[in-house]
């Protein structure tokens, strides 16, 4: 009896291993081929396993996807969804925007990561239907083939360099005011190609170009993580790679989870948030970053207490050094890429009309009150409330808002403590005069 049980267990393990191996080998291909030596009894199970994982990740839609750079990690089980949420392939429910997971480089040590989609599953389905409908094709058309035939993509195929005219009409705030310097940075640091480093796209395959164009059209968040990495001091989580329509980045907890934090932690997070906005407004590269809107899910906190931008999809960038070419949204520039996940009628105002105060006003209106109200002794709380009132007014001038947030930052600095709860600056803060 025991030997029969062991034999059954060994057979099950062998079948599971073969399925995994086939998935790994087939990862970077968008077609399916079956090894001749695979036992016939395993064919349906392996085919079903492969199809399920491929469809969940969006690999069946490549190259209308984000990338394939981290697919091997998924199929070697070096990225695992947290708590093994589903059987066999460990696939979680499909209706979530992001997923907690664990990542390993050696299958021994693991660290938390976040796996996220650029838009919701519902929006992805709407987008795919729009692509098919654009040529009156059935709902199950080849979206990659349709996108490859568009006039915009044909221009991309011929282009040696990514220029502002190639991104005209795309809806992302990131491309609202593109400069050549910014677009060169995109190409030079694009992590989904093998030989990054050049401003020219000679080393890009047709698939590489379609993936980059698709990502820019749907959500530029992964591109921003790549070109402004946290390793260089930018307030962004680390981009680890993409597979299909999912990207993997270092894990953070969203800001809303800290609304009930202690006064010391609330003051520290609010101070960090203002410092982040300051670095986006004024930095060595002379880029002016601004938010078109904010919510608490756009900012996250690492385990060490450090605050970062968790979602960069609402970030616009203006090149103060080179100047920016306003992104015109005329009928001439609009195409299917303009309307994949947004209203085709969105109007973009002039780059010159974005005020310096914009991000500060949004944060003072929507985030800082949730962190700071009712947390401190009366005299201090009154000062904080007064500063918030000033910096949250839409009709205030840039100077008035900047002055109010500078005052608020000074108040918050005095409320920060130096202890192990704030590992990102401890024990260094013990030797800093400001503490």
From Swiss-Prot:
Residues 1-33 form the signal peptide. Its main location: secreted. PANTHER family: DIVERGENT PROTEIN KINASE DOMAIN 2B, GH11358P. Belongs to the DIPK family. It comes from the Eukaryota. Pfam families: PIP49_C. InterPro entries: DIPK2A/B, FAM69_kinase_dom. This is Divergent protein kinase domain 2B. Glycans are attached at residues 102, 395. It is found in: Secreted. Keywords: Glycoprotein, Secreted, Signal. One of its GO terms (cellular component) is extracellular region. The gene is Dipk2b.
């Amino acid at each position: 009896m025991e030997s029969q049980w062991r034999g059954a267990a060994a057979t099950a393990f062998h079948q599971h291993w073969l399925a995994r191996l086939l998935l790994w080998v087939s990862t970077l291909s968008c077609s399916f081929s079956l090894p001749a030596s695979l036992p016939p009894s395993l064919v349906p199970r392996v085919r079903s396993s492969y199809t399920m994982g491929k469809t969940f990740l969006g690999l069946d839609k490549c190259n209308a996807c984000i990338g394939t750079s981290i697919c091997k990690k998924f199929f070697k089980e070096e990225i695992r969804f947290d708590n093994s949420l589903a059987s066999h392939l460990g696939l979680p429910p499909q209706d979530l925007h992001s997923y907690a997971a664990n990542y390993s480089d050696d299958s021994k040590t693991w660290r938390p990561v976040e796996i996220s989609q650029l838009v919701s599953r519902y929006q992805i389905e709407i987008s795919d239907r729009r692509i098919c409908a654009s040529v009156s094709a059935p709902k199950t058309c080849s979206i990659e083939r349709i996108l490859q035939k568009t006039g915009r993509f044909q221009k991309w195929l011929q282009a040696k360099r990514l220029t502002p005219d190639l991104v005209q009409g795309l809806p992302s705030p990131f491309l609202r005011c593109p400069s050549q310097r910014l677009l060169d940075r995109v190409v030079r640091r694009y992590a989904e190609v093998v030989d990054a480093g050049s401003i020219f796209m000679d080393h890009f395959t047709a698939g590489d170009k379609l993936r980059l164009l698709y990502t820019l059209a749907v959500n530029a968040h992964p591109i921003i993580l790549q070109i402004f990495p946290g390793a260089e001091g930018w307030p962004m989580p680390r981009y680890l790679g993409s597979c299909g329509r999912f990207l993997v980045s270092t894990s953070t907890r969203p800001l809303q989870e800290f609304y009930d934090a202690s006064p010391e932690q609330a003051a520290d997070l609010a101070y960090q948030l203002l410092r982040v906005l300051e670095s986006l407004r004024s930095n060595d590269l002379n880029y002016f970053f601004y938010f078109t809107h904010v919510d608490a899910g756009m900012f996250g906190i690492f385990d060490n207490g450090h605050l970062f931008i968790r979602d960069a999809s609402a970030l616009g960038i203006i090149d103060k050094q080179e100047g920016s070419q306003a992104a015109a949204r005329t009928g001439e520039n609009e195409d299917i890429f303009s309307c994949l996940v947004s209203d085709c009628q969105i109007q973009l105002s002039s780059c010159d009309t974005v005020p310096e105060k914009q991000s500060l006003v949004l944060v003072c209106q929507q985030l800082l009150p949730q962190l700071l109200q009712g947390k401190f002794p009366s005299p201090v709380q009154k000062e904080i409330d007064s500063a918030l009132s000033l910096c949250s007014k839409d009709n205030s001038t840039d100077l008035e808002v900047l002055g109010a947030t500078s005052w608020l930052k000074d108040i918050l600095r005095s409320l920060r403590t130096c202890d192990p709860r704030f590992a990102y600056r401890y024990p260094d803060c013990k030797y800093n005069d400001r503490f």
